[in-house]
Amino acid sequence: MPPSIADFQIDFGALEQRLNEHTKAVVVNSPNNPSGAVYSEQTIKRLADILRDKEKEYGHPIYLISDEPYREIVYDGVQVPFVPHFHDDTIICYSYSKSLSLPGERIGYVLVPPAAADSKALYAAVCGAGRALGYVCAPSMFQRVAARCADQTSDIAVYQTNRDLLFNGLTSMGYHCVKPDGAFYLFPQTLEADDRAFSERAKKYDLLVVPGADFGAPVICEFLTV
């Protein structure tokens, strides 16, 4: 669904128009890549209410798949709600590669709450996929390491310092940017119409910039703050 560029929050009117009897799941990513937006408890409650109403209308579960690799990387006291508290039919996908600053290490978990419809079948499907897709099996050593680091995070204060420096610098130069509440990206609007040309020129200055068109939001570019 096209993002709301004004604040990168859910456009509930547009969402309801797109839900139909064929909808099996809705995917949310909060804290969000690339905008850094975080969905509040109020937002998740409203989304859950809509999905429950649609489940009753269509007579089948609509799963809310919550992609949460940046769960711990939030700023200024922002809280990330625990989605299963608001919608039973939830599946959570998590990765330690972000919380432990291990980019490229694809190790994490999929949570299927017991309250989810057909939870045993979902669990079996997740396990089966992990066995069948051998290239996604996490190395046994890193499984042991991750278990011992489960309650640890990288230094979030460093990310916040970088966010503030980049946000203040870009906005002082005239860029419009929604201040991220989480993750480690900024998603400012470029000062020209061609986001790809802007990204190419940025390479000359050793800047890591991704065109917004790759995220369905042209005329915006993603900046990495790490």
Regions found by a protein language model. Give the residues of each.
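PLP-dependent class I/II
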Residues: 1-226
